[in-house]
């Protein structure tokens, strides 16, 4: 089941926008939920691949121009920004694009706190926790870890339950 714009009330409705010009793959029979105020944009020739039991609460922004793979059992808090691109292309003196989109991959069972930013060419390993307010700009290493800004490991050998 896919739920879009949940937790809305008539007095405080946040607009929710989902645009699929590319390919969206929703795997499994579990819950796939995008909260109120989420904005999801999948550009032409891009792929969003969402594993079983995914949930993100309100006001999250997802922009995919190449690929975003989300493993199973991911839970994201509100106010997150996930972008596999820079929003606009930058060209060199030969008119060649110098900032191509680069894919993002979330492993299985990733919990991301509120107001996180995940940018292009990032891999987040399975069984990770991303601390609230973190900005992730590189591939992370290690499972069962809490990561904070710049991919710094805050603690190892941890796990979470919803």
List PLM regions with ranges.
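Long, ordered, amphipathic alpha-helical scaffolds
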Residues: 134-135, 162
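Short-chain dehydrogenase/reductase
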Residues: 111, 129, 146-148
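Tight coil/turn sites that cap or link beta-strands
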Residues: 45, 127, 133, 142-144
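Flexible, glycine/small-residue-enriched loop-and-beta-strand segment within the central core
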Residues: 1-123, 139-141, 150-152, 157-159
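Short, hydrophobic/aromatic alpha-helical segments in well-folded domains
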Residues: 114, 131-132
């Amino acid at each position: 089941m896919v739920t879009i714009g949940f937790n809305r009330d008539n007095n405080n409705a946040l607009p929710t926008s989902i645009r699929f010009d590319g390919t969206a793959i929703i795997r499994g029979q579990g819950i796939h939920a995008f909260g109120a105020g989420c904005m999801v944009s999948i550009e032409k020739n891009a792929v969003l691949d969402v594993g079983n039991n995914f949930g993100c609460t309100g006001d999250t922004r997802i922009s995919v121009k190449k690929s975003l793979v989300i493993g199973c059992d991911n839970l994201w808090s509100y106010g997150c920004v996930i972008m596999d691109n820079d929003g606009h292309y930058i060209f060199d003196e030969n008119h060649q694009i110098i900032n191509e989109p680069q894919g993002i991959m979330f492993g299985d069972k990733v919990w991301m706190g509120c107001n996180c930013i995940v940018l292009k060419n990032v891999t987040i390993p399975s069984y990770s926790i991303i601390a609230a307010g973190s900005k992730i700009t590189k591939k992370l290493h290690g499972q069962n870890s809490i990561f904070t800004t710049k991919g710094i490991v805050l603690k190892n050998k941890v796990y979470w339950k919803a």
